[in-house]
From Swiss-Prot:
A motif (RxLR) lies at residues 31-34. Secreted effector that completely suppresses the host cell death induced by cell death-inducing proteins. GO terms for cellular component: extracellular region; host cell cytoplasm; host cell nucleus. It is found in: Secreted; Host nucleus; Host cytoplasm. It comes from Plasmopara viticola (Downy mildew of grapevine). Residues 1-20 form the signal peptide. Keywords: Host cytoplasm, Host nucleus, Secreted, Signal, Virulence. This is Secreted RxLR effector protein 43. Has the canonical translocation RxLR motif, but lacks the canonical EER motif, which characterizes most oomycete effectors identified so far. Belongs to the RxLR effector family. The gene is RXLR43.
Length: 145
């Protein structure tokens, strides 16, 4: 009896949001944020195909920068730079240049190149860690016997 009541209550709870949303006039497919339509804001969304996939925060400019290229070895002339001291590797960032507290859209003369430290990692091989774990377990089992 209690199970039947619990199932009935669950079904009613699942149906309630669907029934209530039919009476609302706004269509979920047509909902947009205000800044997506305002042409005066730098936060206006652009075509997703044109937006770079990888963005990182640059503490120097305080803005989101785009990653350019891969993690590379620092040349000997830059080994003393702050971004090369930690790991010996660097990655290029394309950051907006701030002038008069205005964030500009991307263009050649309004962007600046910065670097950040990175660590050169081997390509991920998820199966190797699992095999090492299992070999360790097998070794422990054999030692116990």
């Amino acid at each position: 009896m209690k199970v039947t009541m619990a199932l009935a209550a669950l079904c009613v709870a699942l149906q309630a949001p669907c029934i209530g949303s039919e009476s609302t006039p706004s269509n979920l497919n047509n909902r947009h944020l205000r800044h997506e339509h305002d042409s005066n804001t730098p936060l206006q969304r652009r075509d997703e195909a044109l937006v770079p996939a990888h963005r990182v925060y640059d503490p120097v400019s305080g803005l989101a920068c785009s990653l350019v290229g891969k993690c590379m070895v620092c040349p000997t002339s830059e080994k003393d730079e702050s971004y090369c001291r930690e790991t010996g590797y660097r990655q290029e960032l394309d950051c907006p240049r701030v002038e008069d507290d205005v964030v500009h859209t991307k263009s050649v003369n309004q962007r600046t190149t910065r670097f950040r430290p990175c660590s050169f990692a081997e390509p991920a091989r998820p199966g190797v860690a699992f095999v090492k774990f299992e070999v360790g377990n097998l070794r422990t089992l054999l030692q116990k016997l």
